[in-house]
Amino acid sequence: MSEENKKQILKVRDFIEKHNIDTIRLGAVDIDGVWRGKQVGAEYFLNKAALDGTQISNILFGWDVADHLVDGLEFTGWDSGYPDIALIPDLSTLSLVPWQEKTASVLCDIQHLNGEPLNLSPRNLLRKAIEKAEQLGYKCYAAYEFEFYLLNDSIASISADQWRSINPVEKSGHCYSMLHHSSSSDIMGEVRKYMRDAGIVLEATNSEHGPGQYEINIKYDDALKAADDAIFVKNGIKEIAAKHGMTATFMAKPSAEWSGSSGHVHMSLSDLAGTPVFANPENPGALSEVGYNFLAGMVALAREMSAIYLPNINSYKRTAGASWAGGNSSWGFDNRTVSHRAITSAGSAARVENRIPGADTNPYLVIAASLLSGLYGIENKLKPKDPILGNAYKVSPELARPLAASLEEAAGIFRESEMARVIFPNEFVEHYAQMKVWEIKQSNSFVNNWELARYLDII
């Protein structure tokens, strides 16, 4: 064991003893952004898992979000016997799980048993994107903001009712209302406190437009930490809500009558010394040349990345019409109708907001796709078109290419995209597209209440 590893293990032991930890959650994120893993005892973690990792079936990348096995995958399946892959703890992610007694969590990287990083792992893909940025002389920073709904009932009671009634904690939406925010102050206060105790800063929380809808803003950090924090916060909110007998949902559009829930991500770069590079000191109302290049790359590849930014059948119900979600490949200064909002500043606050993703996305993949698209713009010195002034929803397709209108269209675009295969490994592109095609087949085979109500009697 190296001296550095010895120091890390000693720090971990001190942390466990200080907080009287007896359970460690070891987990990694799958293709769909679901955090999966194991819970292990503190002694096993210190003496084995922290040193050598642990193993888990590669079925993590062989099933869908509902744990149904996906047919025909090259990576895994019945023919291969679903063998093991390795979970390697990233000890820098060790943190308390304050809402669970004597519990801590560690995020893991995923490797083949021979030590080779797994190309399907979203966290590994983001690591590679960050490495590419560093090779070009940049560090990437990101900040997530999530919207979600708080529902009065537990997930068990909602599912027992066949998902027919979902009752939000508020009967109407009052965006930014201090009165309506106060009605859920206990649970939102717990969320802020628990995240603070876990070392994550929530800069703000507020009520949103939908009934029982809330927004959280996570403080910016380096790109990998930002994605780690986003996963921790999403899971934490769900668990905290469950302790109150409630359900927190990050579904993009849980009801046709309600506002969609976004998962916008803000991106910026610095040089390797930490100096921000998006700001334009000579013209604080504009971006730097590098900032414009990065923005142009994000806009240019937005349509091809639709399957990552809008990964589920339900995602496309959120982006239909004037919905506060980018529906085309567009940009503008401080314009919330575009897909990419440029926010100018004389200093470190200069950034680009990707407004396409919903709260249902995988943060690692969204940040990786956004970063790699931006780096493509920098490498090729792309120039953005003129900014959209006013309502981007009314702009013609000639001026702003529409994003994919359905998951079926998005999966096809992603699979056929040459650029997707330039910025991501071929293995990932094929696997991801196949998973989305599977999801479409599952949806198409289901008879829903709308069909029954429309056709059962009259046809």
Swiss-Prot record:
Residue span(s) of domain GS catalytic: 122-459
Catalysed reactions, as listed in the record: isopropylamine + L-glutamate + ATP = gamma-L-glutamyl-isopropylamide + ADP + phosphate + H(+)
Superkingdom field: Bacteria
InterPro entries in the record: Gln_synt_N (IPR008147), Gln_synt_N_sf (IPR036651), Gln_synth/guanido_kin_cat_dom (IPR014746), Gln_synth_cat_dom (IPR008146)
Protein name: Glutamate--isopropylamine ligase
Enzyme's top EC category: ligase
Enzyme Commission designation: 6.3.2.-
Keywords assigned: ATP-binding, Ligase, Nucleotide-binding
Keyword flag Nucleotide-binding: yes
Domain GS beta-grasp, first and last residues per copy: 19-115
UniProt GO BP: atrazine catabolic process to isopropylamine; glutamine biosynthetic process
Gene name tied to this protein: ipuC
